[in-house]
């Protein structure tokens, strides 16, 4: 009888990112609401939240909010440009059990863009 050995990939990296167009300007300025969205996205995607930081920037076309959640598996980030009704979303996870696409879809559902792009990159160690 021959033994079967399963070789595991040492690092499983899943990266989902995209751009959201036509998002409500007031929502893109609402730092507290964006923080709550990121926290819930981490929860439903089976990520372990370590810390959330956010910053509100004021001034013309540079105005916006950035929210970055450090999760045990990696990170979630939202950056907004309210004057353009535009946001970027970045969800990167390491590990087999977390689901960055679920987090991305949740964020999109909460921001309700008129249109969006989504990209996926396998960033696993091979």
Swiss-Prot record:
Pathway: Amine and polyamine biosynthesis; agmatine biosynthesis; agmatine from L-arginine: step 1/1. GO terms for biological process: arginine catabolic process; spermidine biosynthetic process. The active site is at 74 (schiff-base intermediate with substrate), 79 (proton acceptor), 94 (proton donor). The record marks 73-74 as: Cleavage (non-hydrolytic). GO terms for cellular component: cytosol. The modification Pyruvic acid (Ser) is found at residue 74. Keywords: Autocatalytic cleavage, Decarboxylase, Lyase, Polyamine biosynthesis, Pyruvate, Schiff base, Zymogen. Its cofactor is pyruvate. Its EC number is 4.1.1.19. It is an enzyme of class 4 (lyase). Pfam families: AdoMet_dc. GO terms for molecular function: adenosylmethionine decarboxylase activity; arginine decarboxylase activity. Coiled coil: none annotated. Belongs to the prokaryotic AdoMetDC family. Type 1 subfamily. Specifically catalyzes the decarboxylation of L-arginine to agmatine. Has no S-adenosylmethionine decarboxylase (AdoMetDC) activity. NCBIfam families: SAM_DCase_Bsu. This is Arginine decarboxylase proenzyme. It comes from Pyrobaculum aerophilum (strain ATCC 51768 / DSM 7523 / JCM 9630 / CIP 104966 / NBRC 100827 / IM2).
């Amino acid at each position: 009888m021959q033994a079967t050995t399963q070789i595991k990939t040492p690092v499983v990296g899943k990266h989902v990112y995209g751009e959201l167009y036509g998002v409500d300007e007031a929502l893109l300025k609402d730092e507290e609401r964006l923080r709550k969205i990121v926290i819930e996205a981490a929860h439903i995607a089976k990520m372990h939240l370590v810390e959330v930081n956010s910053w509100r920037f004021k001034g013309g076309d540079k105005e916006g909010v950035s929210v970055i959640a450090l999760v045990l598996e990696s990170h979630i980030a939202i950056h907004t440009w309210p004057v353009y009704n535009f946001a970027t979303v970045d969800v990167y996870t390491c590990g087999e059990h977390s689901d960055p696409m679920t987090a991305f879809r949740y964020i999109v559902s909460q921001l309700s863009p008129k249109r969006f792009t989504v990209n996926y990159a396998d960033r696993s160690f091979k």
